[in-house]
Amino acid sequence: MRKIGTLGLVTGLTMGAVLGAMSLPTLAASERSAVLEEVVVTARKQEESAQDIPIAITALTQELENSSIRNLGDLNGYSPNLIFGSDGSRGGGGANINIRGISPTRSDDNSFDAPVAVVIDGIYLGTLAGQVLENFDLERVEILRGPQGTLFGKNTVGGVINVVRSRPTGEFGGKFKLTGGQDGQREARLVVNTAISDNVALKFFGTKIDYDGFMDNVTTGRGVAEKDYGNVGATILVDNDRFDALLTIEGFSDAGTLDAFHTNYNVGKDVLPKPPQGSAENDFSEGFTTCLAFGACRTSLATPGFSENDKDNVYDLETEAVTLNMTYELNENLTLASVTGVRKVNEYRLYDFDASAAPFITIERFNDYEQTSQELRLDGAFENLKFTAGLYYFNNEFEQDWITGDTFWGVLFGGLLRAPDIGAVLGVDALAGVPGLVACQIGVFAPVACDSALTMNDISGNITQILYETQDTTSVAAFFQGDYNLTDDLTLTAGLRWTREEKDFIAGQAYLSNEQRALARNFPGYADLSQEWTELSPKIGLTYQVNDNAIAFISYSEGFHSGGFFGVNQNIRDFERDQYDPEYAGNWEIGYKSQLLDNRMRLNVTYFRNDFEDKQESFVALDPDTKTVASVFDNAASVIYQGIELEVQYVFNEYLRGFLNYGRLDAEYDEFETDINPNDAATIIEDASFLNPRNAPDFTLGLGGTLSLPMGDGTLETFVKYTRIAEVDANLLNLKQSKIAERDDLAASIGYYAENWSLVAYGKNLTDERFEVFFPIATLFAAGSVNRPRTLGVELSYQF
């Protein structure tokens, strides 16, 4: 029934737009042009028309001027099978991007790479922090769906978000935007261009954003999702006849409160129903340890309108980045290109992991990240051959201290550590007279360890767990991809990328200490691990020129998502266990692209099938030794993702244009074995292929349009975008409480656009649809996160 309803909605809304357009006056084509503009992209490392290349791509240019696109997180609905989410647990522009059902298994730690890449001005961003880029001074955003391993390399099995910023113009001028909205939203954005000489241009840019949050924390008095963001930088362009260089130096500062773990989902007994007899579902009917111990239980499943965390979930992100793009025209057929990038990120996060008013468990993370990348390319264009060949180097290093505090460890182990005679407590004669703290220090409670420098006085307050990890990743690659015209109408595309990647990982054995010694790094032992992989990523395809305005293509490509070491662990044995290999994608695509009705209509259709092997999966299970929880990570599954994508753009007349993006996705496990109920203290591995792959909605729909009417010396423009996303299983084991129901989002703007200024009112989530996502940690505690409500704002822009 849902399929019929969705298709009916698409048809009804489309027909409504067509009938509405018929009532508008139509000027003759000679008086005013009403066609779709060509969009030039660099999705294949060279400038090409988006309609001429045989890949599934959505390129956004004019759309970025819409005030409802505040940042890349607002791109939902503009491309089929895209869910561009912000990772609230990261803050600082952390991203959680889903393309064709492929999304990060974990996104809270730099030890794990994302399967969808974000690239800005040719630089791959190796950390999820800072990927939700603010929308200002962006020339183009290209959404490449499906594996892009040949040209973009590792970690592109889902696709690539390729962002290109504007180049300096070489003329004095600029623009600024001032924005105000509800909940204390205040934004200012500025770009200024000038010339230094005839061939040297300079651009300055900056953004400042303040936001007071959309929900109150009734315990602390602060807001949820507060934001204090600043970005400043400069770009210099040297442009000679055959050589040009583009250098950007910039800095980011982003601080506030996290948009995650802000609702208390620690329900008491019988609030959540007991699973049916014999069911493998998790049983939360007895309630959660946190609320039962502290009397802070939630009594209703109604979506709350407030937060009650005893500590604010705060973050602070500082980023410095340098990007250098250079090209040199060797002759009329060959161009040499170089792309160099250096990026440093300092990240701090603290979150009240139990999300309640009780001081149960807090996690604090200090992370330093650096990356360096270098690409050298030779781009060629001859009569029947066009190609790109290159070498690539990438290195990143990160170091992270993280601390688990509050009363959690005291509740679990405080009594044992403070015991004057652990032998009497445990009934072990050999330990008679040994204090509990000493027993922990000599390894009696292994794998639980204690700081050798602790004294009994040190553990009179809260006990803190200390963890540490560092990783060095080096990746080198050589690649080639070319198009050869077999005939006037048939083109062969072939490419291959060779990649060698090495990861060196060190992590400390977690131990218990106190807050004063949180960064002492007095670890009783280390996991010192290394892995190296060599991979090939091929691509082959055929493109047929149907006519001057249409192409049909078929292609097969492969990609891989890096292996590694799962850093969110406590014990050396877990780090050694949770080494995982790359996961592999083999993707078939059959597509058709066309420009119809004298360039008034663009119709693109793609069928894809992406076979995932050795898929990386993670779940949380009880540790029988520590009586706490541990993350288990492995190559545990094979999944088939297949579907159809439809993209339509249509210019009804000089006043009205619309778009329709529809993605259908069928995702199912081919093989999957896991412990279906990891909370029962018994590890039973069984067939789990009947589960739905997480974060794989059956469909996505985006439908909208722009109506522009002359008014005085300017234009009155109205924009509307409707987005629908099917139900999603957000949890690996398909917990009922973690399902996100089918949801709608309506965004709109109306504004007056004069020659050099505009005034626009905009809104997002205008239907004020709310939902809550459930994050249980076994039966110890559970946090929730609620999406943002209706958002309204006004924006003034001026160009000079």
Label each residue range with its predicted role.
Residues 114-115, 127, 136-139, 145, ...:
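Outer-membrane beta-barrel translocator/receptor signature
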Residues 407, 411, 655-658, 723-732, ...:
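C-terminal beta-signal and adjacent terminal beta-strands/loops
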Residues 215-223, 259-308, 352-362, 403-466, ...:
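Solvent-exposed loop segments that connect transmembrane elements
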Residues 325-329, 335-341, 346-351, 545, ...:
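Membrane-embedded beta-barrel scaffold of Gram-negative outer-membrane proteins
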Residues 237-239, 378, 390-394, 469-610, ...:
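Structural signature of Gram-negative outer-membrane beta-barrels, strongest in the C-terminal barrel
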